[in-house]
C-alpha cells in the first residue's frame, strides 16, 4: 500500500470554507491494509453531507489519499495540548462499526 499522511488529508479538508476542523485515521481494510477515514466538524450553520465532502476531497487530493468514509461530528476531539486525539477517533470508529 501507499503511505497517507493524516495531516495532508486534514489540510485538504479544512481548505473547504464550510469545514472548521478535520481529523483523519486509518481503518483496517482487507483490500488495502487501511482505508482513510475522516471526522469533520463543520462551521456553524454549514450544511454539507458526508458524500459531498468525500467527492470534494477526491477532486482535491485524488488517488488513494481521499477519505473513503467521512463522519460529520459536532467537534473533533483534542488532546490536553490541543492536538487531534487520533486514539479517541479510532475508538469512535471501532464503536460505530459494531
Regions found by a protein language model. Name each.
Residues 91-98:
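Acidic/polar alpha-helix N-cap and adjacent early helical turns
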Residues 70-73:
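General small-molecule cofactor/ligand-binding pocket signal
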Residues 1-65, 75, 82-91:
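AMP-binding/adenylate-forming catalytic core of the ANL superfamily
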